[in-house]
Every structure is written in structure tokens, then in C-alpha cells.
Amino acid sequence: MASTNALSSTSILRSPTNQAQTSLSKKVKQHGRVNFRQKPNRFVVKAAAKDIAFDQHSRSAMQAGIDKLADAVGLTLGPRGRNVVLDEFGSPKVVNDGVTIARAIELPDPMENAGAALIREVASKTNDSAGDGTTTASILAREIIKLGLLNVTSGANPVSIKKGIDKTVAALVEELEKLARPVKGGDDIKAVATISAGNDELIGKMIAEAIDKVGPDGVLSIESSNSFETTVEVEEGMEIDRGYISPQFVTNPEKSIVEFENARVLITDQKISAIKDIIPLLEKTTQLRAPLLIISEDITGEALATLVVNKLRGILNVAAIKAPGFGERRKALLQDIAILTGAEFQASDLGLLVENTTIEQLGLARKVTISKDSTTIIADAASKDELQSRVAQLKKELSETDSIYDSEKLAERIAKLSGGVAVIKVGAATETELEDRKLRIEDAKNATFAAIEEGIVPGGGTALVHLSGYVPAIKEKLEDADERLGADIVQKALVAPAALIAQNAGIEGEVVVEKIKNGEWEVGYNAMTDTYENLVESGVIDPAKVTRCALQNAASVAGMVLTTQAIVVEKPKPKAAVAAAPQGLTI
């Protein structure tokens, strides 16, 4: 028995090379020549064990997770909403921001956590597209999913229900676009910002003041202040619609952004692929201990790899973005950035090569912020005269052009050069209060720009309640019975945010919803004053874009949940038992 085992072990452990040589020698003896091809080694990867749930079990587990997360987020909705304490790293945070709460929640049960992850997705998508309305989107999604699953459990076709939901939401979005009215002046801007900041009038006033200074095409930046006061300052700057080439350049992982202060700026229309072209420049900026921002046509291959590796090792403090625009417009935009930063544009058609660039030819940016899809450059005041001269030149070109496209692009460039950046410096007595205020101001800023973009509608969930009155007409156009069920689900879900706002204010939600339904489009419930009034006139307004994105994203994720029949999650590993204390020791 032992010899058999020894033989089998030998045959298994024999190296592939020896086996190949033996086979080769046999074939050479038989035929005189052979084409040798070695078989590749094969690796087997064993996946972790999974738990699988089907049908009602999977749906109920997901629903439980969705409810837990939506309940926590829903507490913050409305002017009478509560705060939530997040105990993460360092001191606990007191927040009133839906997406921040959603991102912080991880449930211990993996199946419930899968449901919670879907609501996190709704909140994140709404935050990315509109910048606000994350709580409303989460509540809408929970309600559509809950009502939809009840119908699916009763035997309705989930695919048809999803189609009905999608068709109804698409029709409601068209109605919303017709009903939204454009922003009229600073009072509307102040009202939108105040509501989004949790009815903080001071923040609303500051946002309105900042936009008044930089205009609707300007940029608002939020920073921490060294004092207890919150102030607004306007600084020269420009926003570019290009983000970092590689996420490895990120300096602030929490926000996934690059932040530089007193950075040198290289501006060129050339493609950089060989590291030897920029090594002299990297050495000089490293000696100056200054960060380096590279704006070029592209950075690829060896150059990009070297920059990333040295950035990760802490040797270089560098980031790179692609040049904005295309063709001749790209050169014009790069010249704008060069004038803003005081750099010399390294243009290939002028024979100015990157490898010959000196420190004196680099620009200087007091602050640079780069996200995945945009870059904000705040320049030094030294280039102000040249900047004004450039703006005057662009205005002259604008007056002479007949092209609508060119006039739009020139107006955009003038706004970016002359508007500058309004910096809101946030102050607070404690770190916890500072974080909360910054989140509120961020929401207010995003909501304000969303309102300028697509107009405003009555707030407090009122617009959604009134939209529910348009559903019966949409439903009549649907022929399939299950699709009509989808329309009914949307109609019932639309009243949930208004009902929850009233509930958080201590009022019966259903009563409030019925009174809103019987009123005009702009009339609704003001939870702050506990009255029914014209919300637009009293300043309780929401951006139409926020309402639209909340509804679309909620319906999108809800449709995916309703058409889900099984969940596959990783099986939790059993925790190791605590070792017993050795005998004779006192614990």
C-alpha cells in the first residue's frame, strides 16, 4: 500500500519539463522529428461559499434592508426633520444630509445589506446628478419597491409593472418640465438655498450673495475658515471640464479629489509619453517643494506610469489633466489658462518643446481642486491686468462674430475668466458643527445651480403630490393591466415625501396630502409655519431638476428590485471561538 502511494505521489509531483522531455524522446525515436508544444499550467481558483435566496425569501430580506436605511434617512426630511449621529472615525458627526447617512450604513445581514445598498445607489446617483434631493429619492424608491413587491407577490408580472412605472415616470417628467418656472432674481436663489440648507437663512443669503458676485456661470468653492465666522470672498479662478487622468493622483480619498496649494502649472498642447521629456522639470519642482499640475493633450505610457508610481511613493506631488476643448478652440482655452496662471503656453507649432521648459515658464496657481470630471484653478492676483486685457479681447471677438455657436463659447470663456470663484469660508465653534454646516452649504450650492438650470417648483413634496393628479390620464393610455398597476404604484408613492415631512412635524400625513391635492399647483403645506399657503410666494421652493432626478433614479432602482428573483451573497464566516483561559490563571 505504501509503495502504491509513493508511486502516485511521484507521478503527480513530476515536473512538466521532465514529462515533456520523456514524451519528446519517445517521439524522436519513432519519427525522427517532432513539433514540441508545452501545455500551459492551469490554476483553479476556488470561490468563497455563497448563500442563495429565491422568490419571497429574497424579496423580504431586501425589503427589510431597504426599510432600515430609508427609515434612518427619512428622519432628516423637512424643516422639522431630526439629525442623525454617525459614529465613524474620530469624534461622532451630527448630520442632516441624506446621502452622507446612507453611505455610512452597513447592515450585518448580507441579504438585508444588499437591499440597503440599492437605496445607497439611489441617494448617490441623485447626489451626483442634482446635488440634492437624496432623502426624497430614497423615500420614493422605498415606497415604489414596497408597493411593487406587494403586487408581485400577489401574482402580477414584474416586467410589465416595471414598464408601467417607466412609462408613467417619463410622462410625469414631461409635465414637470412644463410646470417649472424659471428663477427670477436673487430672492428665488436665496429661497432655494435656504430650503436646501435646512431653513438656514444665513446660508441662503450667503449663496445668493456669492452667485450675485460671480454670476450664474461662476464657480462656488467651499473651504474651512480659521475663525468662527462664515464669510464669502471672490477670488480669480477658472473651472475646466476635465478631471484627473488617473485616480492615483487623488490627495483627498474621502472626497476623491486632488487638492494643491501654491502649485506650478505646465500648459502644453503636446502629448507626453516619454518620461525623459519631463524629468528635468520634475526635478526642479521637487527641489522647490511645489506641487505640479500638468495640462497637456494627453499623458500615456511610460510617462504616466512613472508619475503615478512616484506619486504613490511620496516622491512627487503631481497631477495631470487633459487639455479642454478640441482643435483651435483647445489652443484658445489653453492660452486662457496660461494668462490666468501667468504661464507660457508651450505650443508645438511655435517650436516650444516640453523638454526645454524652464521653471520661469510655468504658471502659478494658489489653489487647484481636481475631481474626476472637473478642475478649478484659483490664480494669483499678479496676472489681473493681463486677465482684463484678455477679457476685453474676447468681448471684442464676441461683438464681431455672427455664429451662434461661437458666441456661446466666447460668452462661456468670458464668464470663466471674469466671473472668478466665490469662496465660502465656513466657520464653526467645533469640528462636528463645521462638518454639518459644510454639508448644508454644499447641498444649498448644488440646489441653487440646479434651480438656475431647470427652474423651480413648489417645495415640501407639494410638486410630487400635484403630479400624482396627472397619473390617471397617463394610466388610460396604458393597455396592459399590469402596466396600469405600475402607474397606480407611482401615483401612491408620489405622496410619500409630503406625508413624511408632515409626520416629522407632528402632523397626520394623510390629512395633509388630501388638503394639498385639493389646492392649486403652487399651494401646499408649510411645515415650518404649520400653514397651507402659496409656497412659491412664501419661498418654499425646490429645483425642478432635483425633483426630476429624485423621481427618475427612484423608479430606475425600484424597477431593478421588482424584476429580481434571487439574491446571491457571500456566506458569513463563522467567528472563531474565544480561547479558554489556562487553568491556574486568574483573569
Curated annotation (Swiss-Prot):
Q: Where is the transit peptide?
A: 1-47
* Biased composition annotated in UniProt, kind: Polar residues: 1-25
State the GO CC annotations. Answer: chloroplast
Location relative to the cell: Plastid, Chloroplast
* GO MF annotation: an example: ATP-dependent protein folding chaperone
A biological process (GO) annotation for this entry? protein refolding
> Which residue ranges are recorded for the region named Disordered?
1-33
* Main subcellular localisation: plastid
**Subunit structure comment from the entry:** Oligomer of probably six alpha and six beta subunits.
Its recorded name reads: RuBisCO large subunit-binding protein subunit alpha, chloroplastic
**From which source organism is this entry?**
Pisum sativum (Garden pea)
